[in-house]
């Protein structure tokens, strides 16, 4: 086993994981990218864990399908269209992970020649044909196990995007086989570079996949969404006790919302909350799903008031709803507002008439950006994807369609049930109401 493979295993699974990393956890991650029989463009997830890779791939696949494809019927995909969609999506994610866009890409594959011999000896019977062995080896996870699988992988490098695209297409059958998700994950990690990832992760000793529960870390999700393996979801970097905590530095193509924000465990910044396309990964305590729409008006450019709210909140990292009055000048400069000392003092007195030494967000926005509501339509068609069969209506992996109504205020006449998905979406649209076409709300788990 090469030194690089050992480093990769340590980064993904942790140092103490190798001997016993529970083969159960490893087996949960050993699946390919497989399309649902009930929904031509939806990927299936067989067990808990690999949603950290499958959900981002699904989100980028939808971006390609809805906003770059000329298909009139986006829910019908032939096998050839599935192949093209998946391969283009994998290339897009690899391209965004490529450090400084250096043009150096990696693909990790399985040494099939060795695998044939290994599998034959493991199963105790000689291979009757290479095709048969290839099929059996793709299913032989339990026999291969964690250590042996990692002894059989190899890396190939490519210097240009066209070369990479050809190779990804050539290896299409590999992406669908039993190890496709892991091989793609390893390809992303080596394209990014192990050292680069360690420099971005807050705690490099924490593995990307939890060795006990098998869930992917936030760093892993962020890497696939943005190309950066940072551990936080806020905008920009922050300092805490002299330590620099890295966040998201630019608007993401695909967004991220989490139930953890509704439960007040974290706050997602606007770079993830307001992405370039109306597609969001939605996180619960244990699973990732995808919420999306086809209406680009949902991601219209930030209104000045929304930009002001975002900037104000960067100076209010604890989400108190106020800043010390000493920071008012910095906020006004960041927003290109008049910021000469005399005017600043005038504003301090106006916004803090009681002399408490704080500036509240509400009065600040009302003073400088009055009557500017949030942009975007009031009603729109939405869809939800969950890759787990057992979590879907009728146990079929299909998009659930619904109508979302977004008001600028609470309307008791429109109020719908309080569900986890609604609570999660309220972190983006506080007064959203949802009406689904199925008998029950889609599950986040």
From Swiss-Prot:
Family annotation (Pfam families): MINDY-3_4_CD (PF13898)
GO annotations of cellular component type: nuclear membrane; nucleoplasm
Enzyme Commission number(s): 3.4.19.12
Tissues showing expression: Widely expressed with high levels in heart, skeletal muscle, and kidney, and low levels in liver and brain. Also expressed in lung (at protein level).
Chain positions with Phosphoserine modification: 125
Primary localization class, coarse: nucleus
Keyword Metal-binding: no
Keyword Glycosyltransferase in record: no
UniProt catalytic activity: Thiol-dependent hydrolysis of ester, thioester, amide, peptide and isopeptide bonds formed by the C-terminal Gly of ubiquitin (a 76-residue protein attached to proteins as an intracellular targeting signal)
UniProtKB keywords: Apoptosis, Hydrolase, Nucleus, Phosphoprotein, Protease, Thiol protease, Ubl conjugation pathway
Coiled coil feature spans: none
Gene3D superfamilies, A to Z: EF-hand
GO molecular function terms attached to this record: cysteine-type deubiquitinase activity; K48-linked deubiquitinase activity
Active site residues of this protein: 51, 287
BP term (GO), one: apoptotic process
Subcellular localization(s) per the UniProt record: Nucleus
Function: Hydrolase that can remove 'Lys-48'-linked conjugated ubiquitin from proteins.
UniProt family annotation: Belongs to the MINDY deubiquitinase family. FAM188 subfamily.
Record note on quaternary structure: Interacts with COPS5.
Name this polypeptide is given: Ubiquitin carboxyl-terminal hydrolase MINDY-3
Species in which this protein is naturally found: Homo sapiens
